[in-house]
Amino acid sequence: VDPALVEAPLGHRLWKHEMFLPILMLHRVANRDEAMRLANDSDLGLTAGFYGGVDEVPWFHEQIEAGVTYANRKQGATTGAWPGYQPFGGWKGSGSTGKAIASFYYLAQYQREQSRTVVEP
């Protein structure tokens, strides 16, 4: 599938469904707050990207509802789990446990806890 830029009405299904295709949806907005509201108006939240100034990047990371976020990332950079460097997991309907693969907390969900008490005679 060739990459595509698509401008479609906000009610179009491409706005609400994960396609895993090289499609970038376009919609004109009045300001960044409107853009963020539209970005977060989704039942999904795997990845999100942003291009902006140094002063805008912290705002983006605090506001976006996605598990893997990028700011000012150049084309061709990887998206994926790098153990010890980049956990990979989605929020909302894009995740199931809230714990990302390769995160500090991921392995613990597969471990069994056991409390042991020994009273010496």
Identify the role of each PLM range.
Residues V1-P121:
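Conserved C-terminal structural/oligomerization subdomain of aldehyde/semialdehyde dehydrogenase
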